[in-house]
Design a protein with these regions (language model features):
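Accessory recognition modules or surfaces
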Residues: 2-4, 41-45, 50
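Short, flexible hinge/linker loops that cap or flank conserved catalytic cores
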Residues: 1-2, 24, 83
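Glycine-rich FAD pyrophosphate-binding loop
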Residues: 24-44
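Beta1/beta-strand and adjacent pyrophosphate-binding region of the FAD-binding site
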Residues: 1-15, 31
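Dinucleotide-binding Rossmann-like beta1-alpha1 core, especially the glycine-rich loop
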Residues: 48-110
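Anionic group-transfer/hydrolysis microenvironments
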Residues: 8, 36, 53
Length: 110
C-alpha cells in the first residue's frame, strides 16, 4: 500500500510546524513539506519575542495562551525550546497614562 496523509502542510516555519504538531496530536496523519530545513525562513530569523502587551483583549488572551505554552514547553512537547522569561519596559508619554491604566485593567481580567 502506498503511504498516504490526511493533511499535507507546505512550509516548516512556526505556523506549519505548529499545525503539523497539533494535528498529529489529534491522530491526523500529517506530511510536512519544507524546501530547505525547519525554520529556514522568517521563523529562524525571528527574535523569538513572546509579547504580552496588546490593546485588544482577544490578542492579549492569545498571547497569554502562547506564553503558557512556551513556559511549559518541556512538559507539553519535550526538550528545551530555548524560551527564557525576561522583561519589557515601555516609557509612555503622560498623555497615554489613562489609556495604559485601562489596558492594565483589561490584562488583569485575563
Amino acid at each position: 500500500m502506498k503511504p498516504t496523509a490526511d493533511m499535507i502542510i507546505i512550509g516548516g516555519g512556526i505556523h506549519g510546524a505548529s499545525l503539523a504538531f497539533h494535528l498529529a496530536q489529534r491522530g491526523v496523519k500529517v506530511l510536512l513539506l519544507e524546501k530547505s530545513y525547519l525554520a529556514a525562513g522568517a521563523t529562524g530569523r525571528s527574535s523569538g519575542l513572546v509579547r504580552m502587551h496588546y490593546d485588544l483583549e482577544l490578542e492579549s488572551r492569545l498571547a497569554w495562551e502562547s506564553f503558557q505554552y512556551f513556559r511549559d514547553w518541556r512538559e507539553r512537547v519535550g526538550g528545551d525550546c530555548g524560551f527564557r522569561r525576561t522583561g519589557f519596559i515601555y516609557i509612555a508619554p503622560p498623555e497615554q497614562t489613562e489609556a495604559l491604566k485601562a489596558n492594565i485593567q483589561m490584562h488583569q481580567r485575563i
